[in-house]
UniProtKB/Swiss-Prot annotation:
GN (gene name): SUN3
Compositionally biased tracts (Basic and acidic residues): 141-157, 421-433, 445-459
Biased composition (Acidic residues): 100-112
PANTHER family attached to this UniProt entry: MEMBRANE PROTEIN CH1 RELATED, SUN DOMAIN-CONTAINING OSSIFICATION FACTOR
Keyword match Endoplasmic reticulum: yes
Pfam family, any one: Sad1_UNC
Name this polypeptide is given: SUN domain-containing protein 3
Region of interest (Disordered), ranges: 50-75, 93-120, 141-194, 418-496
Transmembrane segments: 25-45, 612-632, 640-660
Length: 660
């Protein structure tokens, strides 16, 4: 019995010691686990807890760009607080997760650009307002324009209010974008409305200009045929005369000798002579006669070789002829021709530079512009070959006689026929003035007054026709002596009686033309008097139109002042809106910072919960193992097994709660 009791006591003591050792080991393990949990919590709390991606991944939050969030944006006029901002924390977190430094910098740059755009739009809008007001249609009463500009600020305020209401229900990033779009849109709307208004005003101006042109055409409707001025008439006659003279010059008919040869004005037999030459020249007078054995001789090395020839008469020089027949000499190459009407003189008229060929026969040179001269000067510039002497055998000059040319200038049948040729459609008008002129020469004063009344009724073109007809008539009267002159001997002078007869007839024609010009001036005076009366009447009408335009401009100026004041009010309103926008952006930045702190706190709590869950899971596993071992050995007591069961239940409950 004693042995069994001792055995039992020993067994119980061993069990108690084993139980104590087990509890000690268990307590040491629990203490070690709690120490490990504490250090792991500290390490996790000081780790990479500021990242946003783990929070999104762990909490299963959606990307703010994918869906349409339901959070609300507090209006500018309403107070902003953390309580109102934390109504929906999940949406706020999802809204701020994608905000980073690069996006903030981009937003600031965009805001700066938009602010500059808005300021530029303000200036443009102000300038366009002034343009608009200055280009308002003058036909409008001004009421529509005033109501339009009065409604413009109201419409802008309504649009801006609608913009703020529409932006409620968007996230902060969308809010920024929408505000930027609103700013840009406001400027674009202003510019588009201004452009439309300018286009409309330009169309109105075009219509107004067309109307003004129509009115002017209506005012100018009574057509008035302005007659040609006297200067224009004289210039027309002189131009036709000059044209005929130029035609004659281009086709100059040289004066002919009785034998049919051309008249040489540089012939010694006609009275021409050599006046001077360079001192080295020998035989200068030989060039005025046709003797092949005589010539003008100059050493080729001499500088400034020249010869001055006096023509037999003053003439219109058109052609000169030179020749060198000496074989053993150098031919003339380049020479200059000068002329004058008086000698001696210091100023010679340049008539042309010519280049001769290296030949031993006569060469003709025609002047581009024939000149009236009496004295010719030939300057020898260069020569051909390398002979010692440069020779010239012959020089001849051809042209028109001065007296004959003067008579042709005074009275030319061809010129009169060409200058006063009737125009198409005016033959009927010109026949009547010719008859009137003939009747004026033979009728008395009463007939003259009757004809003058008829002439006043006729248009001024008839007066021009009368003048032309009278001059044509006078030219017909003067044609007979000219024909006599033309049929006279070709090389002889006309008698003095013929010249006097021609001059007297010319004076008669001038007297007749003077009377016609006097009547022409009377007609011009009458016509221009009527024109001035019409111009005075038109000036009165235009003065009334100018007064009306001045009144319109005064009304436009008043409307412009009103529009400028409205533009200033709009500018102030924009400044207030910009200030509110800046305030809202600052409050948004504060909310974003607070939400970042909340997100960090939540992430830290999440990691703590994860740690606690891990520890509880470990304790639960240990408790399960202990219970299984106790049940397997059958040595566990109820108190010990109950403690492990309690630990298992508590760990399971904590894990269940954390998993929810």
């Amino acid at each position: 019995m004693q042995r069994s009791c001792r055995t039992r006591r020993r067994v119980s003591v061993n069990k108690f010691n084993g139980r104590n050792s087990f509890y000690k080991v268990s307590l040491s393990l629990v203490f070690l686990l709690w120490v490990l949990l504490f250090f792991s919590t500290l390490l996790i709390s000081h780790g990479d807890g500021a990242k946003d991606e783990p929070l999104n991944d762990s909490m299963g939050m959606a990307d703010p760009d994918d869906g349409q969030s339901d959070e609300k944006v507090v209006p500018f006029d309403g107070p902003l607080s953390l309580a109102s901002a934390s109504v929906d924390v999940t949406s706020d977190l999802s809204r701020n997760d994608d905000v980073n430094l690069s996006e903030e910098s981009e937003d600031k740059e965009q805001e700066a650009e938009i602010s500059s755009t808005v300021s530029g739009n303000d200036i443009e809008s102000k300038d366009t307002y002034l343009l608009k007001q200055s280009e308002i249609n003058k036909k409008d009463t001004g009421i529509d324009a005033g109501s339009k500009y009065d409604d413009f600020p109201k419409k802008s305020e309504i649009n801006n209010t609608g913009t703020w209401n529409d932006t409620e229900g968007k996230d902060d990033n969308n809010f920024l974008k929408q505000s930027q779009l609103n700013k840009t849109g406001t400027g674009n709307d202003t510019e588009s409305s201004d452009n439309e208004f300018l286009e409309q005003n330009q169309m109105n101006k075009t219509v107004l200009g067309n109307g003004t042109e129509i009115n002017v055409s209506k005012v100018d409707q009574p057509s008035r045929a302005v007659p040609l001025g006297l200067d224009e008439f004289k210039s027309r006659a002189s131009n036709s005369r000059n044209k005929s003279l130029s035609d004659q010059v281009s086709g100059v008919i040289h004066r002919m000798e009785p034998g049919g040869k051309e008249y040489n004005y540089a012939s010694a037999s006609k009275g021409a002579k050599v006046l001077s030459s360079n001192k080295e020249a020998k035989g200068a007078a030989s060039i005025l006669s046709r003797d092949n054995d005589k010539y003008l001789r100059n050493p080729c090395s001499t500088e400034g070789k020249f010869v001055v020839v006096e023509l037999s008469e003053e003439t219109l020089v058109n052609t000169i002829k030179i020749a060198n027949f000496e074989h053993y000499s150098s031919n003339l190459k380049e020479f200059e021709l000068q002329g004058t009407l008086v000698y001696p003189t210091d100023t010679w008229v340049h008539m042309g530079n010519f280049t001769a060929s290296n030949v031993k026969h006569e060469q003709n040179f025609t002047l581009l512009e024939p000149k009236w001269v009496r004295y010719l000067k030939l300057n020898f510039i260069s020569h051909y070959g390398s002979e010692f002497y440069c020779t010239l055998s012959l020089i001849e000059v051809y042209g028109v006689d001065a007296v004959e040319r003067m008579l042709e200038d005074l009275i030319s049948v061809q010129d009169n026929k060409n200058a006063y040729k009737p125009r198409e459609g005016d033959s009927e008008h010109k026949e009547k003035p010719m008859q009137q002129i003939e009747s004026l020469e033979g009728d008395d004063g009463a007939d003259k007054s009757t004809h003058r009344e008829k002439e006043k009724e006729a248009p001024p073109e008839n007066m021009l026709a009368k003048t032309e007809a009278s001059m044509a008539k006078s030219s017909n009267k003067l044609s007979e002596p000219v024909e006599e002159m033309r049929h006279h001997q070709p090389g002889s002078r006309m008698p003095g009686d013929t010249v006097l007869k021609i001059l007297m007839q010319k004076l008669r024609s001038l007297d007749l033309n003077l009377s016609i010009l006097e009547r022409y001036l009377e007609e011009l005076n009458l016509r221009y008097g009527n024109i001035f009366k019409e111009m005075d009447r038109e000036a009165g009408v235009r003065e009334k139109a100018i007064v009306a335009l001045r009144l319109d401009l005064e009304g436009m100026k008043e409307r412009q002042e009103g529009m400028v004041s409205e533009a200033e009010e709009m500018k102030e309103w924009r400044k207030r809106v910009e200030a509110e926008m800046e305030k809202a952006e600052k409050e948004k930045e504060n909310i974003r910072q607070s939400l970042e702190q909340v997100s960090k706190r939540l992430e830290w709590m999440e990691k703590k919960c994860l740690t606690v869950f891990t520890v509880c899971l470990g304790f639960g596993i240990i408790a399960v193992i202990a219970v299984v071992i106790g049940m397997g050995t059958g040595l566990a007591e109820k108190t010990g097994s109950g403690a492990w069961l309690l630990l298992l239940i508590s760990s399971t409950f904590i894990m269940f709660v954390l998993s929810l």
